[in-house]
């Protein structure tokens, strides 16, 4: 009787297990981004993105990025950087099921900087990101292009310009 109970319990637990073809709704991305020059200022930085897909095409993102701002005159100091935290939302325009090449996702983000810095800012961004889903690979390359608007809170002029992002998704 005990054996039958254990077998029944194990069978009931196995019913809820998903097959290997199912994708985990949680993903991480690490990337480097670089923006075009605007008003004698350009930026580059490192990004960390924690994403969750509650439904098939929609994703919610928590972002952290550290940006280094480069003035045209080249006067770089330690205070030319800012650390931003924020979030975003994404929608898969083309997904791997309908398009064999991979997934094309449209994302909108909003971040704000932490601490006191000359380059304290609020950042608004929209971008297209391409990545390939593969069951054979744990790491997929991510390529993104988009437009970023930064509203600086100090004497620095606001920044508007395109950016390119390259990274790894796992």
Enumerate the predicted regions with their spans.
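Short glycine/proline- and aromatic-enriched beta-strand/turn motifs that initiate or cap beta-hairpins
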Residues: 19-68
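Membrane-helix boundary connector in multi-pass membrane proteins
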Residues: 131-133, 148-154
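Outer-membrane beta-barrel "beta-signal"
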Residues: 89-93, 157-170
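Solvent-exposed loop/turn segments connecting transmembrane beta-strands
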Residues: 33-45, 73-79, 112-122, 151-159
């Amino acid at each position: 009787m005990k054996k039958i109970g254990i077998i029944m319990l194990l069978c009931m637990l196995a019913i809820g297990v998903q097959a290997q073809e199912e994708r985990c709704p949680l993903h991480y991305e690490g990337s480097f981004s670089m923006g075009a020059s605007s008003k004698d200022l350009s930026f580059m930085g490192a990004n960390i993105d924690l994403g969750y897909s509650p439904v098939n095409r929609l994703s919610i993102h928590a972002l952290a990025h550290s940006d280094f701002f480069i003035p045209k005159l080249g006067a770089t100091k330690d205070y030319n950087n800012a650390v931003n935290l924020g979030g975003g939302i994404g929608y898969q325009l083309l997904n791997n099921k309908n398009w064999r090449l991979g997934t094309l996702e449209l994302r909108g983000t909003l971040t704000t900087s932490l601490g006191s810095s000359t380059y304290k800012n609020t950042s608004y961004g929209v971008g297209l990101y391409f990545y390939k889903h593969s069951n054979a690979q744990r790491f997929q390359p991510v390529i993104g292009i988009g437009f970023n608007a930064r509203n600086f809170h100090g004497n620095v002029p606001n920044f508007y310009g395109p950016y390119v992002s390259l990274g790894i998704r796992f």
